[in-house]
Amino acid sequence: MLDIEFLYNFYYYIGVKKISKDSMENAISPVVEGEKIVVQGAREHNLKNVSVEFPRNKLVVISGLSGSGKSSLAFDTLFAEGQRRYMESLSSYARQFLGRMDKPDVDLISGLSPAISIEQKTTHKNPRSTVGTVTEIYDYYRLLFARIGRAHCPKCGREIKEQSVDQIIDTILSWDEGTKLTLLSPVIRGKKGEHVKIIDDAKKSGFVRARIDGLMVELEDSIKLDKQKKHTIEIVVDRIVLKEGIRQRLADSVETALKSSNGVIIVLRRVNKDDEAYASVTAALDAKGTPYDRNAAYIEQEVFFSQKNACPDCGISIPELQPRLFSFNNPFGACPECTGLGEKMEWDKDKIIPDPSLSFNERGIEFYNPESEWNKTMFTAVAKEAGFSLDTPLNKLTKKQFDYLWNGDEDIVLNWVYKKQSGEGYSEYRRPWPGVLNDMKRRYNEAWGDSQRVNMEEKYMSRHECASCHGKRLRPEALCVTIGGKNIWQLTELSVLQTIKFFDELDLSETETKIASQVLKEIRNRLNFLKNVGLEYLTLERSAATLSGGEAQRIRLSTQIGSALTGVMYVLDEPSIGLHQRDNQRLIDSLTYLRDIGNTVIVVEHDEQTLRTADWLIDIGPGAGVHGGQIMASGSPEFVASCKDSITGRYLAGLIRMKIPSERRKGNGSFVSIEGVSEHNLKDISVMIPLGAFTCITGVSGSGKSTLLNDVFFPAASNKIMKTDYPAGVYKKISGLENIDKVISIDQSPIGRTPRSNPVTYIGVFDKIRELYASLPDAKARGYKNGRFSFNVKGGRCENCQGAGTITIEMNFLPDVFIQCDVCRGKRFNRETLEVLYKGKSISDVLDMTIEEAASFFDSIPHIARKLQTLKDVGLGYIQLGQSALTLSGGEAQRVKLASELARPSTGKTLYILDEPTTGLHFVDIKQLMGVIQKLVDKGNTVVMIEHNVDVICQADYIIDLGPEGGDGGGRVVATGTPEEVSLNKKSWTGRYVAEMLEREKARGEVKE
């Protein structure tokens, strides 16, 4: 049963009229017809033994305050059980490869389908993943280019036609007389297996040698290949010296090689250093980035011939057009210099020597600690040889001295004597100085583990575009193949909208159309699915790691739409995140399409338009955390809107609204301006941000909001004011910063990386709580210090569970079992530590309190209560003090950071930057958050926020609207001014929706609270 008294008080607290007991007893509508999904006794997380039913094959939206239990029902109960049942239908052998699923805490779920979860997390951290690879469109591109692509010579650009045997022979005979050749027939190219039959057949055919994985071997020898590895086998058909009368033998050998390898032959051409061809051959090798020994008397050039692809003028052949040639994740297609990444980590002199005005002894070379006896001894010898002092600032060294310090000299042998650390004797060293750069490279290559290498990369390296492929990831042979005048990389650089237009206008021959029709159909479908979920501004070459959570989720949604599965239960987590109101209808159309083809679509959502479109609405509440977990209303949106005990229902009925300010702040008269911003799609724009006011940056998805605020403005302002060293995008000038003393960006990244991190450790209040316990008379009598009350270090924690409170037991084919520690009984600390009490509560009891409870408990300790109150003020009163940071959503993590900043003393001259802080928030939570933000501005601070929520935009003092479209169609300032001024701009999409909201409020008259 619902706690009626609590509900009364809760609604009174948030400013909603009290409700009647009768209305609460009639808030659940039964499913009257058709198949249904029934949940009975769900107790996962904060769900209070709830039971609910809803129709199958419908669009079902779950709403409620943040932390009320929406995700617990949707993901941790429905999805988890649907996936678990499917996995249990598999064999135990198959299950071992698929991970283990916990059984949710629920009595019964009936009517479930196999479940697919589409969450808002950005899961693609691999730098090789792009929008194209994630959506599989790039796979179809590779197939398309392999089938109808037109190859061109990488050197002269001429279209390459098929090569006949005579053309191949003529090309070889055009080389200098006396040239030594080895003719290879590549019978196996990069395939796994032992390939015993291939080798035996070659022997039987009379061949005696082969090149296997780059090494020449005798076929008579015992050859054993690892069947788990990929191998390349090239049979040596003949070894020839070019001379008069050799044509017939050469022709026979070429034909034999071509026949054995399906029209492909490799010729190893020995070019001596004094040959005329040496310069042109080495130039070609350099252009391709192919390594060779520059000091050798000759080089062996590998010339690839094909009966299909070769330039008759330059003699350049390219491999057979296969899909793998166009893959930057395959060695046959990837740029050999950067291995398909498009960029390389290179040593950054500015990071190694961040301040050249310092000397070595002042740690001018960041990597080398001058206090180290080894470094001191070694660099003393270096300085002596170069003729400078270790106290000399590095920027005062001569060019010759610095060159020796940086690059070394292998011809100069240094002597130095090193005193052993043990103090027992000395060691004498005689060796050349390799230079700082080479010494760091050696240490990097010899590093004992990945963590040490990663540390060196982060500290002393920077990413730079690959000089060979210029960021295009592919080898030249792949980039010289075109369709419609564009190579595959140029095609991926187009936005989704531009690509759709490209394929619509593509002119193909009848034969090409017949070959490519099915592939083009798949490409067009997937591109249109991306467009329909509001991602038409994305380019396919964009790294998947740079996508926001909402973008990543909508990409996965488009992939699922493309798969056209039926009979599935889809569970989505706020797919409208990061989406402008203009694009919302297309997203809803995609969700209803999934429903219409025969799927159950369950969406956790706060967006009003989505709530009204739902076939069935489940509202969970009434509050968050321990105050939530109950079904407040269940039925059609119209039914829920009639339920007086449902906050969401009252919101849909228009009974609660966020009051629009009657007056807008003018600011304090000062502005921060940034001019000439040209990063990404921004088109040399300039904007002015009023100080002492609340500004919203708006615009359709992909219009350039994040680029302007996060990639350019914040790093530029922070570098000037906070003396940071963030990489800033392209801009010409930033001014007005003298009027602010701090700039703080509050994003949605996690507040901790381990399960032991929690909100109170992040904001620093747990240190104060530990200090309080250590200052108690009982703790002092026992000699306890602050560390005694930490569960992260030895001393006060329970060592049986190492402060975790639980013991993990691994089960083979069953989920891991977490049992309460039988020593501390889940308290985390040992018995002696728990005997120290404050107001009758131990340190463990405090960690189990909610923020709301703790704020009341510590009300007599101002420096603790004040920080806890800030967490409560941003709507986090329901979370526990000891709750793991890993369980917090992105929105919750952002609000913890906001609370941390609010807890600091305000100067009234701080500029706060927020990126969609309303993500994951219910209307009531947004109302509370906006109260906090408005208080910040009332103190004289400046808040600049990226936002799509029209309710929030209408609260702003000033709007900067970018657009008018996304991608190349955006990047311009469309409108600026107050919401009322922007609403009059007919070119602004944001202005249209703001105008609608203002009109609605005007028609409603006095807002009902």
Residue ranges and their predicted role:
Residues 2-1009:
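Conserved phosphate-binding elements of NTP-dependent enzyme cores
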